[in-house]
Each structure stands twice: as C-alpha cells, then as structure tokens.
C-alpha cells in the first residue's frame, strides 16, 4: 500500500505527523494531490480544547471516522485519480475543497444537518 504523511489529531494538544495508507478511490470519489492546505479555526479549536466536533467514542455519522483523524479539510490541489462513477471532473483538473459531509450541504442548506 502506498503511504502518505498526515497530521493526525489524537486529542487536545496531541497532533502527530504519521505515515498512513493512501485511501483507495471509491466510485464516487476523486484522489487529490494536495498542493496547499491550511489550519482553519476549527482545527485550532480542536487542537487547543477538543474534542468539540471530532467523535472519540463512536464513528462520525457521515464520514465513518473517529479518533485519530487527519486534519486539513480545506485545501487545493490537482486531481490524480477519479472513481468509476465520477463524470464532472477529470485527472489534471485543479480544485479547491471545503468538504462538509452532510446531505443537505449537497443542495446548499448547511444549517439543516445535525452535528
């Protein structure tokens, strides 16, 4: 399995740079070679005082993840692989990402999904 480095959140003031497996691309997903990423306010608050939104005991309702989680959810890069069901973007496209894992977000209704 191919590896990548990731900033992994384990708890308040406990972020570790680790080698993790590069995830396999599922049919409705793309793989992005990240060129730039930042630390947003949510990352900072999770680092200083978390857990706030990061699930520690049970899996997140949409992502299925729990601690440890990889930080850096706002980024820019280039698509390097597309899943079999992806039709709107292609390898080589440059993209920016603010992933919000919520059903209502798909239609722009950020305020209707549970935290």
Language-model-derived ranges and their functions:
Residues 2-7:
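Short structural boundary motif marking the start of a folded domain
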Residues 8-10, 48:
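Residue-level signal for short segments within beta-strands and strand-turn junctions
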Residues 13-17, 41-42:
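Short N-terminal binding/cap micro-motifs at the start of the first secondary-structure element
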Residues 19-21:
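Generic structural detector for well-ordered beta-strands
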Residues 23-37, 52-110:
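Glycine-rich beta-strand-centered segment in the early N-terminal region that forms part
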Residues 40, 113-115:
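Disulfide-bonded cysteines in secreted/extracellular proteins and peptides
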Residues 45-53:
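Short Gly/aromatic-enriched secondary-structure transition segments
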């Amino acid at each position: 399995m191919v590896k990548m480095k990731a900033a992994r959140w384990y708890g308040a003031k406990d972020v570790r740079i680790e080698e993790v497996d590069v995830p396999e691309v599922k049919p409705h997903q793309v793989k992005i070679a990240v060129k730039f990423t930042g630390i947003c306010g949510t990352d900072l608050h999770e680092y200083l005082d978390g857990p706030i939104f990061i699930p520690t005991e049970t899996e997140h309702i949409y992502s299925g993840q729990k601690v440890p989680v990889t930080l850096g959810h706002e980024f820019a890069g280039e698509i390097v692989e597309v899943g079999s069901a992806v039709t709107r973007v292609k390898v080589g496209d440059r993209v920016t990402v603010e992933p919000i894992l919520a059903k209502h977000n798909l239609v722009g209704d950020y305020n209707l999904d549970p935290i």
